[in-house]
Design a protein with these regions (language model features):
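P-type ATPase nucleotide-binding
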Residues: 148, 333-458, 467, 476-495
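Transmembrane helix interruption/hinge and helix-loop junction motifs
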Residues: 29-33, 79-87, 258-259, 587-595
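Conserved ATP-binding TGD loop and adjacent catalytic N/P-domain core of P-type ATPases
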Residues: 395, 427-570, 578
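Short, hydrophobic transmembrane alpha-helix segments
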Residues: 22-36
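Conserved catalytic phosphorylation-site environment of P-type ATPases
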Residues: 72, 171, 267, 280-353, ...
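N-terminal membrane topogenic signal
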Residues: 1-14, 238
Length: 619
């Protein structure tokens, strides 16, 4: 785009100089009509060539009627009726307007790309006897890299030596440095602030976090909002209609009114064509959406397309998963309650049985056990999502899960009076007791729910946990609806039923962790995943990604989406209103060709300023 801006700027500058020479020459010298035509034709052809080039590109896309055709017809017609100066002036101002449009789009994209240009140029690969600089693209998993202070992390990796603090602002929008040590995951695009780190490569450069984020932002243009489609569809019908109107202005008045001069009405018709150019309408809508996506990315919120940005502004209901979304998802063992074995045995067997599970509860059980897991002691393991698992540990048959799982297996299990999640355990066909797990509500969840309530947005929670735990969380956060005890597939069905029974044209947003909620994220109008940093599942499944586990970012995203839509609507109303006014004035001869183009440029610039202002101060 930089080359295109430079080329257009040179064309406009050259044409402007020749236009001034032509005006001065025709004003101070007695020139024949043919000579006047020649000196004005040169700057006109320079700019007309650029217009024809744009028109030809659109023709290849089967788009004939556009602003390029209107200005070409109008200015060529002005030449035909010997209005050379006005024809060149109109074409010059039109091309300057297109140049400003290109510069605005280029700068907006550049600001996003600059912010997202987080891929380093090199990596320090550790080799025998030292290190060597290589392109990040040459790195492979399991190789060891060295990251020095002030260098960017080249690829996703895990720290094997050293400790440091990282600046992750480009990825997460979070200004607080992040401390890392041996065993910490580090993500491409972060900046090492202090110590020297050695890290083992986890992913190739193309699959690392920075590259995937940049690709996602770059492809956001491909998903267009309904308002963008409306603007394009409107101009598709608008342009041929105003072309016909301009022709009728040239033809009908001389036929209908006695004494009407054919030449004067032809000129008015040409002005109508110039006044009808929809440049201000076309540029302001996509630029506002592009700016909105860029503003959100600077807040650590990645939006995959303008259609999702628009949908978010219309969201009237937010559905939240409980574990890891409204709660911290960092479980703690509150109590070990054995029946037929010792507490130590119950915890040890359960930790071993859960050794291969990725569920947060499994991690809390292993953490509570606190010792290394000898996987040689573990035999066959079979998971039942939403219920529990079967495992063989030390030759003993374990069945570990929730109350539903115990019911399925036919065990008489102990009812739990305390609030929390009970993990029941059976050993060799005999109920052995339960372990009570607790979670805590996120600090920012309460603030988010209060804000949503003020905005008259409904808040719903769905969870696979039991009703008592779910009701306790709902009571703390004052949720509107709660659905508990749901299997993963039942969550999708519950969201579908809620949309059918409670909603009409409103949009529903689902907020989850992006790992276990992919089906629900896909089914909702807007799928929002938390903790996208380092989560492949979140980057793939969600429409909007919060790069940090921070629910307050949702407030920022909603404000930006509403500000964007407000700017788009204001721009559309203003642009269409000004077009109607200009067409009326042009029809009655109150506007010259140059003034019509200047008015269109003014509309475009006002809309651009409005878009930037609204996005800077969304609410």
């Amino acid at each position: 785009m930089k080359k295109e801006v430079k080329r257009r700027a040179i064309e406009c500058a050259a044409a402007a100089v020749l236009y001034i020479v032509a005006i001065v020459g025709s004003s101070y010298a007695e020139l024949e009509r043919e000579m006047r035509l020649l000196i004005f034709l040169l700057p006109y052809l320079i700019m007309a060539f650029a217009t024809v080039r744009l028109l030809w590109n659109n023709l290849k896309k089967r788009k004939l009627f556009d602003e390029n055709l209107l200005i070409l017809l109008a200015t060529a017609g002005a030449f035909a009726v010997h209005r050379y100066s006005e024809a060149v002036g109109a074409m010059l101002f039109f091309q300057i307007g297109k140049l400003l449009e290109l510069i605005s789009m280029s700068r907006t994209r550049k600001s996003i790309e600059k912010f997202m240009d987080i891929r380093p140029q090199y990596a320090n690969l550790k080799i025998s006897g030292g290190e060597m600089q290589v392109p990040p693209e040459d790195l492979n998993p399991r190789q060891v890299i060295i990251i020095k202070p002030r260098e960017r992390i080249p690829v996703d990796a895990i720290v094997t030596q050293g400790s440091s603090t990282l600046d992750t602002k480009a990825l997460t929008g979070e200004s607080e440095p992040r401390h890392v040590k041996i065993g910490s995951h580090i993500y491409s695009g972060s900046i090492n602030l202090s110590g020297v780190l050695e890290a083992r490569v986890l992913k190739a450069s193309a699959d690392s976090t920075a590259s995937r984020i940049i690709d996602m932002i770059s492809n956001a243009d491909n998903r267009r909002a309904q308002t963008e489609n409306f603007a394009e569809k409107f101009t598709r019908y608008y342009t041929p209609l105003v072309t016909l109107f301009g022709i009728l202005v040239m033809i009908l008045p001389p036929m209908m009114f006695e004494g009407a001069q054919q030449g004067a009405w032809i000129y008015r018709g040409l002005i109508v064509l110039v006044a009808a150019c929809p440049c201000g309408l076309l540029v302001s809508v996509p630029l506002a959406f592009l700016g909105g996506i860029g503003a959100a990315s600077r807040q650590g919120v990645l939006i995959k397309g303008s259609n999702f940005l628009e949908a978010l502004s219309k969201a009237e209901t937010f559905v939240f998963d409980k574990t890891g979304t409204l709660t911290e998802g960092v479980f703690r063992v509150k109590e070990v309650c054995p029946k037929s074995i010792t507490p130590e045995e119950l915890l040890e067997l359960t930790a071993y049985g859960e050794a291969y599970s990725s569920h947060p509860i499994s991690g809390s059980l292993r953490e509570a056990y606190g010792r290394p897991i000898d996987k040689a002691r573990i035999g066959a393991v079979r998971e039942f999502p939403g219920f529990g698992l079967e495992a063989v540990v030390d030759g003993k048959q374990l069945e570990i899960g929730n109350s539903k799982f115990m019911n399925q297996q036919g065990y008489f299990y102990q009812r739990v009076a305390d609030i929390g999640t009970a993990v029941h355990v059976a050993v060799d066909g005999e109920y052995a007791g339960y372990i009570l797990i607790t979670d805590v509500v996120r600090k920012e969840a309460g603030r988010l729910l209060k804000w949503l309530k003020k905005q008259q947005i409904e808040a719903v929670m769905i969870t696979g946990d039991n009703e008592r735990v779910a009701e306790d969380v709902a009571r703390q956060l004052k949720l509107d609806y709660v659905y508990a005890g749901l299997m993963p597939e039942e969550k999708v069905e519950q969201v579908r039923e809620f949309m059918e029974s409670h909603m009409e044209d409103e949009k529903l947003a689902f907020v989850g962790d992006g790992i276990n909620d992919a089906p629900v994220l896909a089914h909702a109008d807007i799928g929002i995943a938390m903790g996208g940093l380092g989560s492949d599942a979140a980057l793939e499944a969600a429409d909007i990604i919060l790069m940090e586990d921070d629910l307050s970012r949702i407030v920022n995203a909603i404000r930006i989406s509403r500000g964007t839509i407000r700017a788009v609507k204001q721009n559309l109303i203003f642009a269409i209103g000004m077009k109607v006014l200009l067409l009326v004035l042009a029809s009655f001869g109150y506007v010259t060709m140059k003034n019509a183009i200047l008015a269109d440029m003014a509309v475009m610039m006002i809309n651009l300023l409005n878009s930037f202002w609204v996005l800077k101060y969304p609410e």
